[in-house]
Amino acid sequence: MSTPPLPDELRRVHMVGIGGAGMSGIARILLDRGAMVSGSDAKESRAVVALRARGAAIRIGHDASSLDLLPGGPTAVVTTHAAIPKTNPELVEARRRAIPIVLRPVVLAKLMAGHTTLMVTGTHGKTTTTSMLIVALQHCGFDPSFAVGGDLGEAGTNAHHGSGECFVAEADESDGSLLEYTPDVAVVTNIEADHLDFFGSAEAYTAVFDAFVERLTPGGALIACVDDPGSAALAERTAALGVRVLRYGSAGGRDLAGALVGWEQQGTGAVAHIQLAGESAPRAMRLSVPGRHMALNALGALLAALQVGADPDTVLDGLAGFEGVRRRFELVGTATGVRVFDDYAHHPTEVAATLAALRAVTDQAGDGRAVVVFQPHLYSRTETFAREFGAALSAADLVFVLDVYGAREQPIAGVSGASIVEHVGVPVTYVPDFSAVAAQVAGAVRPGDVVVTMGAGDVTMLGPEIIAALQARANRTVPGAGAR
């Protein structure tokens, strides 16, 4: 297709927080479409290095003078994301100079103009489902543009400017910004109260999904997972508005466009048996990622791909090769017979789904234990869901709970990782000292165990440290190990 020209205001862009998952993706697409891009971030990262290699001018640290990084004239627009405070010196300087400041979703919406847009949202699973859809369409030869909240294993990137008509993107609901978009196809994986620090109530959180699907283009479609009560209710309300709704899931008694009729764990992958509406026999859907929740995500991605004319057999071939998304049950490595995974789960439902997949892996492997290293994310979420986190973590055999990763929040009196520990029903250790975690875990596990580090904060750094600690312990037990 012929890509529409960039709007003038996006030809010279300064991005505050350019290294973040969402912002770096937008920067990649802008650069690929010929924009001049500058930016700043608090620290160096793989994303920052990659963007510099593509031509972006990036400064580490935040300073008003960063608005002048681009040669040949002033910055036309400054873009940022909701987590950056308004007191940031670059935003203060932009207001002083009367340079427009827009949030990331506004820029993404402009970049999607002229494309057939497929968007995935929901409380859980949106990054993985979006990524599955991207891989499926790529396998079908569509070359979609895309922006997603995690790096695809196959592509090693979170965004791409493609030559095809489709644009696939993840719609983040956490701050209501998904209302900037007008999708042609919307996939909703589930709806469960979250981000109450922003929305204030479960009702307000749910309402943003209704408002989102009301923005579907004429003739557009909602694809909703009806195994989830919140998404199923949204499907009913949306259908009542006359919008085309395609339901998927395993719930009986439903008019399903796609049904998950069976699922079998196979190592760290699975085979799902699915029934598509109008077909006489079920199909086998092979996946390289574990967990029933992954099979449902893949089914939603399949239905979305079919809406733009993809061949179902080719889509299934593509899904079989899907390697996963960084930090979604990602294998970090193996040492002394212990496998270590890393996962982004930071809500009780996500924790439960990941542990179900982990349990399936350990059950197949033999007598190894499921070991979880969990870092709560946000004080408000920990306070609200402490009991639910404890119940979800109790599906493991051994649990280590770290202190809260506060991110954008200030501490709340009386709220810590210990708030969760008291609700865990299996052996659990509270480790508030981050530097002590790897050694404690390495000292507690044995060959055959499977460890998963879990959370949305810097717990992801612990996987390599645990592997190193295991290797160090093994070396100490071998006579003469390390001798010169």
Curated annotation (Swiss-Prot):
Residues forming coiled coils: none
UniProt GO BP: cell division; cell wall organization; peptidoglycan biosynthetic process; regulation of cell shape
Transmembrane regions listed in the UniProt entry: none
The protein's Enzyme Commission number: 6.3.2.8
Reaction(s) catalysed (UniProt annotation): UDP-N-acetyl-alpha-D-muramate + L-alanine + ATP = UDP-N-acetyl-alpha-D-muramoyl-L-alanine + ADP + phosphate + H(+)
Keyword presence, Ligase: yes
Localization of this protein: Cytoplasm
Enzyme class: ligase
Keyword Cell cycle: yes
Domain of life: Bacteria
GO molecular function: ATP binding; UDP-N-acetylmuramate-L-alanine ligase activity
InterPro entries: Mur-like_cat_sf, Mur_ligase_C, Mur_ligase_C_dom_sf, Mur_ligase_cen, Mur_ligase_N, MurCDEF_pg_biosynth, UDP-N-AcMur_Ala_ligase_MurC
Pathway assigned in UniProt: Cell wall biogenesis; peptidoglycan biosynthesis
Chain sites annotated for binding ATP: G122, T123, H124, G125, K126, T127, T128
Keywords per UniProt: ATP-binding, Cell cycle, Cell division, Cell shape, Cell wall biogenesis/degradation, Cytoplasm, Ligase, Nucleotide-binding, Peptidoglycan synthesis
Predominant cellular place of this UniProt entry's protein: cytoplasm
Record family assignment: Belongs to the MurCDEF family.
Function recorded in the entry: Cell wall formation.
Stated name of the protein: UDP-N-acetylmuramate--L-alanine ligase
Origin species: Mycobacterium sp. (strain KMS)
Record lineage: Bacteria, Bacillati, Actinomycetota, Actinomycetes, Mycobacteriales
